[in-house]
Amino acid sequence: MFDTHTVEIEWAGRPLKLETGKIARQADGAVLATYGETVVLATVVSAKAPKPGQDFFPLTVNYQEKTYAAGKIPGGYFKREGRPSEKETLVSRLIDRPIRPLFPEGYKNDTQVVVTVVQHDLENDPDVLSMVAASAALTLSGVPFMGPVGGARVGYINGEYVLNPHLDEMDESSLDLVVAGTYDAVLMVESEAKELNEEVMLGAVMFGHKGFQPVLDAIIKLAEVAAKEPRDFQPEDYSELEAEMLKHFEAELREGYKITQKADRYAAVDAVKAKVKAHFFPEGVEPKYTAEVIGAVFKHLQAKIVRWNILDTKSRIDGRDLSTVRPIVSEVGLLPRTHGSALFTRGETQAIVVATLGTGEDEQYVDSLTGMYKERFLLHYNFPPYSVGETGRMGSPGRREIGHGKLAWRAIRPMLPTAEQFPYTLRVVSEITESNGSSSMATVCGTSLALMDAGVPLAKPVAGIAMGLILEGDRFAVLSDILGDEDHLGDMDFKVAGTADGITSLQMDIKIAGITEEIMKVALGQAQGGRAHILGEMAKAITESRGQLGEFAPRIEVMNIPVDKIREVIGSGGKVIREIVEKTGAKINIEDDGTVKIASSSGKEIEAARKWIHSIVAEPEIGQIYEGTVVKTADFGAFVNFFGARDGLVHISQLASERVAKTQDVVKEGDKVWVKLLGFDERGKVRLSMKVVDQATGQEIPNEKKKEEAAE
């Protein structure tokens, strides 16, 4: 019934198995991939023909984690998986980025790649395996795909590169880098690092590229026995149309791209585009080409002209040379009632970034396949349509916004203080108010400024820069701080963030083969210079974290209590802790290890809560005098609440120095009294005395003390 084919290899000390022919046989391509004991199913379906009028390649990648893969049941009322998590969105992008450039230009058939995690061994992260499985499924599908693509994770532990480290090894690693590519080219890099230099980062990229070569061999081996017949796809040849367009409009287009101001340049290019349409769509004549074809070729021509100009003149669209960064203005304290704020403007790219400090209650609970964990640093990136002068949808963040936010998050996180050093939850929101390239790197810079303005003790300021690279034959140009117009015409786009001493995040997207290690080294060196320049400009606003928190930020005091006292502080059904919160106004968070965080914008509220908790967990000392409240009277004495929630008995003989006939003759419920702790009886009950204490002053009465000692 099944025509199953399997290839197995040993990869980084663990077995990798690729299997096809048994599951999801109606898909164009399907591969069940196993690494260690983590299993993913990747499927590919591509429409047989493009939709009429389709003018782009509609590729969709969906990565999904099923909770059953880790032996769990989803939370929530419906008990089933809901909308994609942040990780699912990020891994979908991770798979998409290296495979998209390998589809031939002109292929516009609706294509969907679905990767499902069906088993997780809690040792091997499914993201790299998913990339491999998707590549294998595409290679088998018969869809025009110039792969295969391989992928690998690289760690850096004790000065050594590690291929595909286990999840628990990543805690020791100063690098988390994922690299993908073909036999002869690196196509994608995504990373987070702890201030590593350019040489180490580039070495990791090349180490990973070498490390996934056996995976490419395995995919080819599987394709030799299981691949479907390649679909017949011949891209249209529009070289004749391009030549005619060049002949008539090259000069005008070149003039348009000499205009350095974005809006004026767009207007000039649109005017040329209108002339192109008039030329190729004369009235009363049947057009030779469709509007979609004319638009696509014109766009291609725009890219060519800009690339030629840059390579020939070493001058950019906006008049800059290759390495100059646009003018930068950094401001902090823009919104004084927020906890920390910054406005970062670089050319026509601008971000308002606001930092908010919260308590442990504000931490984000993340339910992943590897278990529930809490995240104390949140960074949210928003890209409203007005930032590029357009109208558009407003609502929940899209994949791009989530991806850009995570890139900035990775860049900043290595410089954050530990929870012990700074027990706050941090949320940063970046509102992109203008965009003309590199808004994610503006977010990095603005986040660094806003956190320092908020008084967060960042180890060092962090800056980011977006770079481009153009390669034609043996000529190449590296562009620093690229514009939006330059973003798509380059052969390599990469973003580097870090401090003055090293890289904290590197993201690369390489679209062609031929970009050598030496070229990447030159590009990273130029990026280092740009990053240093931006850090210098940021320093004009603020150089280090403020010595104190903002006026409106909460204060947090940390204290530790014995674990066996946690129940007493919380109380039955949370009664005690609720009372402390209500009476003092402070927020209280208690960890399982006995760490107590007390938060409030008022120092008095924090101190009141601290004293209350201390009175609950501390043990009263024999011989000490305490203030208390009579909570109950009886024939044999009075019960007094003292030392927090603790009660003790003042026997009728200890109420006063003279003989007392009735307890109520001396005290009533609600009376404030001074008591001395005499000790504990054989059952552990507290024995108190009032008669040895002056009820007016709270001081011990010397004569009564002597009598007491004589009696003992």
Swiss-Prot record:
One of its GO terms (cellular component) is cytosol. It is found in: Cytoplasm. Its main location: cytoplasm. Its EC number is 2.7.7.8. Pfam families: KH_1 (PF00013), PNPase (PF03726), RNase_PH (PF01138), RNase_PH_C (PF03725), S1 (PF00575). It comes from Rhizobium leguminosarum bv. trifolii (strain WSM2304). GO terms for molecular function: 3'-5'-RNA exonuclease activity; magnesium ion binding; polyribonucleotide nucleotidyltransferase activity; RNA binding. This is Polyribonucleotide nucleotidyltransferase. Its cofactor is Mg(2+). Disulfide bonds: none annotated. Belongs to the polyribonucleotide nucleotidyltransferase family.
